[in-house]
Amino acid sequence: MNRLKNNENCRLLLKILIIFAISRLIMLIMVPVYNGIMGTHRSFLFLMNEWDAKKYAYIINHGYTHPTDIDPQANWAFFPLYVIMCAALKAVTGGLINTYVIGMIVSNICIIIAAFFAVKGLKKQTSIKEEYTMIMPVLLFMAPYTFYCSSVYTEAMFIMFIVLFFYFLFEKKYMAAGIMAACSSGTRIVGCILVFALVVQLYIDMEGTKISFGKVKTFVMDMLKAPKKILSVLVCPLGAFAYMAFLNFFCGDAWAYKNVQIAWREDEYFPIIGVLWKACTGQIEPRYTYMGWFCIAI
């Protein structure tokens, strides 16, 4: 017992679990508050798993929509790694646990792991005081819209893989970082862009922070002599490529995850600026307006 008390990782995990428990207790308290205000009798599971959570639950139970299905909103837009993990856990439990509970267990475990390694990374890579590093789990568990990280959504798993990617990257464990990037790209398509962070960090570690034609040339030559580093880069988008290969086999369109999204919306926005402008001016759904103003505030 004394060894556990003196173990830094155990102490950190205990602090994170206490913050996590408080945050989830607040969520539970909000259920009767919501029902009292709205005059409803909805359960915690119902309130926590709205919108796309139902799509993920369907995929966990039944798999992806067959190409001959009449539903125009085919669920190919949802990447598979989170679903695979949930389906595996459901299989292990013999299907006795509600699908939404399974998904929430996976999401909550993922966000706890993310918080743990985020704090560890901050301690190793910065001079921030220890008490200030605990702001990270508070934000991950209690910030607006972090309820998604407790629901049947990919957010928690995606955040976990991103945190682990940067944790291993700064530990110079490039292959482990590449695998985390591959997992993130199998969770959400934007995980593919982590390959650029890996290449930049490799350049900094091998050539320093200054950029010149000569140094770039040297970097390329050095990389060609280091097959493990090249492999760590090539692995990064593997999750997305694997899903695209599946879609090509399953429905004949490797880009189906992108093409099917027209069934949800036809409008196109200029990245970041266009979305924020339309969100903050109330041109899209109210929930995006709230998120838009929150993004500007932080």
Predicted regions, residues:
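Membrane-interface transmembrane helices that cradle and orient dolichyl/undecaprenyl
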Residues: 126, 130, 165-176, 206
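Short hydrophobic/aromatic helix or loop-helix immediately within or flanking a transmembrane segment
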Residues: 50-65, 71-95, 274
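Short, Lys/Arg-rich, polar N-terminal cytosolic tail immediately upstream
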Residues: 1-10, 212-219
